[in-house]
């Protein structure tokens, strides 16, 4: 008697977890109570004709999933075809990802030694500029395959950069001349020579930032930019059927509630735009914490139930975390990338409006030679004092520098790795990143992959733009100084690694300059410190030197 009561209690506890009305649950328990094993009978009643005596629980998976997902029916979803699939053993499971569309995304190793590359370039010039044969094992320079590799903007970009170089050099020469005049030995002492060299380098770095901000200010003041990618004449019409876009959110051990809240806001905004059929969403998880993995899957299931997102909002977790974020995106490209014309990369803290996403896809359609269009995300969403100071600062000077970068770079701009749209086909063809050979901190997986991907995209003839005047793109700042330092350390290492690729064959000078500015962003600090040390040493020399009042005998 006690055994039968225990079995019935187990069945009652089990039914309490099922997504049933009270009346349906009571009816199911009443029928199951007449059996010798109530729990097995519950599975029998749920499975119906598909009941398997050897695997009672397994045979009732499909009806239990349907009961759990009945909220999706309110959204008009075809539950059978979109929410469920079968594995190779014929078992019913949730369709977290679409059918595979495999594509090749491979790369050949490169030789990233800048000195060797420099010597090879000098050798080619001395020998008459023969054909550029790649070193054994290195990646060959691809032929440009974009519709308009140069673009009508290319002449304007060349003229603007010539002006920038002239302004920086002229300003640096004048400043160095006056600096020489105020030094005690007027540049005749060895310490002063070293100081002047550092001064010229650092002043040129500051001058480049000054002219970038100045031109950004003038650009925003005038308000008209004929070369802005956002000024393209694009009809605000429905996207064509072939312009399917995948919105990717790579995550790794993130705050699950925050991630899915941001994704929900983006999804709802896209649906309100009336262009939702052109977009699919992918949560690409590299999470290693088992508790967070469970929370992510539950959050995905809840999101799909609430918005009817089965078949449109997908979730994939990698078991083997290879090459971090770039490897996460590469895995998507190999498995499903060929099914889409474009993809938008989001960070875990990113939010983008539907109008912004639709506009990006329309700009891609209107500019067939554009490979990447990067938005200028606004910092928002944090409430700590440190983050609010950072948000205020980026709101003040961020638009100036972004507009200035666009003015000088045009279609050879930065890509920051998120809040940007990418043309999938050339990305698959040209932007796979091999590991950097060697040992140590500056080898292995490329950390600042975004700069390298932009350089490779432009090397193949595709333009990289910054849509600095496009609204609707947001990101969050680190909430405290420790998180800021962790991120900055990663960026510092990544930019120093990228300098190994500075002399890679075929890269455009504009992107070589991007690599150099990335290095200077962190190298300038020790250079300033060295300048202070030299100035202190010069002061000591001048202080302790014995003055010579008489330069000739018997004076």
Set out the residue ranges of the language-model regions.
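A short, charge-rich alpha-helical start-of-domain segment used by transcription regulators
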Residues: 1-19
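Conserved RNAP core-binding helix
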Residues: 8, 21-36
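Short, charged early-sequence alpha-helical segments and their helix-coil boundaries
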Residues: 37-63
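Basic/Trp-rich segment in TM-proximal cytosolic loops or flexible interdomain/linker regions
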Residues: 125-169, 184-193, 222, 226-234, ...
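Internal catalytic domains of large membrane-associated glycosyltransferases
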Residues: 211-214, 218-507
């Amino acid at each position: 008697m006690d055994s039968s009561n225990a079995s019935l209690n187990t069945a009652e506890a089990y039914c309490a977890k099922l997504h049933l009305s009270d009346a349906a649950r009571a009816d199911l328990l009443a029928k199951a109570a007449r059996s010798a094993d109530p729990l097995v009978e519950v599975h029998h009643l749920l499975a119906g004709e598909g009941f398997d005596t050897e695997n009672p629980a397994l045979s009732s998976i499909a009806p239990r999933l349907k009961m759990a997902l009945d909220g999706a029916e309110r959204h008009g979803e075809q539950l059978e075809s979109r929410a469920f699939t079968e594995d190779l053993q014929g078992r019913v499971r949730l369709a977290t990802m679409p059918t595979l569309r495999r594509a090749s995304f491979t790369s050949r190793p490169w030789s990233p030694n800048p000195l060797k590359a420099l010597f090879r370039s000098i050798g080619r010039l001395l020998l008459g500029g023969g054909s550029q044969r790649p070193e054994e094992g290195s990646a060959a320079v691809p032929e440009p395959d974009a519709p308009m590799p140069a673009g009508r903007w290319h002449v304007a970009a060349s003229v603007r950069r010539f002006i920038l170089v002239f302004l920086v050099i002229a300003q640096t020469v004048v400043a160095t001349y006056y600096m020489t005049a105020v030094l005690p030995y007027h540049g005749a002492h060895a310490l002063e020579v070293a100081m002047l060299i550092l001064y010229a380098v650092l002043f040129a770095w500051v001058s480049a930032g000054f002219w970038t901000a100045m031109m950004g200010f003038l650009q925003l003041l005038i308000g008209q930019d004929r070369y802005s990618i956002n000024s393209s004449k694009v009809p605000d019409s429905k996207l064509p059927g072939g312009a399917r876009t995948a919105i990717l959110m790579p995550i790794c051990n993130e705050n699950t509630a925050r991630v899915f809240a941001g994704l929900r806001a983006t999804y709802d905004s896209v649906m309100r735009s009336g262009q939702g059929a052109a977009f699919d969403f992918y949560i690409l998880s590299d999470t290693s914490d088992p508790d967070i993995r469970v929370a992510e899957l539950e959050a995905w299931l809840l999101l799909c139930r609430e918005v009817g997102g089965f078949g449109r909002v997908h979730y994939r977790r990698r078991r083997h975390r290879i090459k971090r974020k770039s490897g996460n995106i590469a895995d998507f490209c190999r498995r499903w990338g060929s099914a889409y014309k474009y993809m938008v990369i989001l960070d875990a803290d990113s939010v983008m409006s539907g109008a912004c996403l639709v506009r990006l896809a329309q700009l891609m359609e209107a500019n067939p030679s554009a490979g990447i269009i990067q938005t200028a995300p606004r910092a928002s969403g944090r409430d700590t004092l440190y983050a609010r100071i950072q948000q205020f600062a980026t709101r003040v000077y961020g638009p100036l520098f972004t507009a200035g970068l666009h003015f000088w770079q045009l279609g050879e701009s930065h890509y920051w790795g998120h809040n940007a749209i990418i043309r999938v086909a050339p990305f698959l063809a040209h932007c796979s990143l091999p590991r950097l050979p060697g040992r140590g901190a500056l080898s292995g997986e490329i950390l600042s992959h975004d700069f390298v991907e932009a350089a490779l995209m432009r090397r193949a003839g595709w333009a990289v733009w910054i849509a600095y005047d496009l609204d609707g793109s947001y990101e969050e700042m680190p909430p405290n100084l420790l998180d800021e330092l962790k991120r900055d350390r990663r960026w510092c290492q990544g930019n120093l690694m990228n300098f190994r690729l500075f002399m890679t064959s075929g890269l455009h000078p504009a992107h070589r300059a991007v690599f150099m500015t990335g290095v200077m962003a962190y190298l300038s600090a020790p250079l300033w410190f060295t300048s202070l040390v030299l100035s202190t040493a010069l002061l000591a020399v001048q202080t302790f030197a014995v003055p010579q009042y008489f330069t000739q005998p018997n004076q």
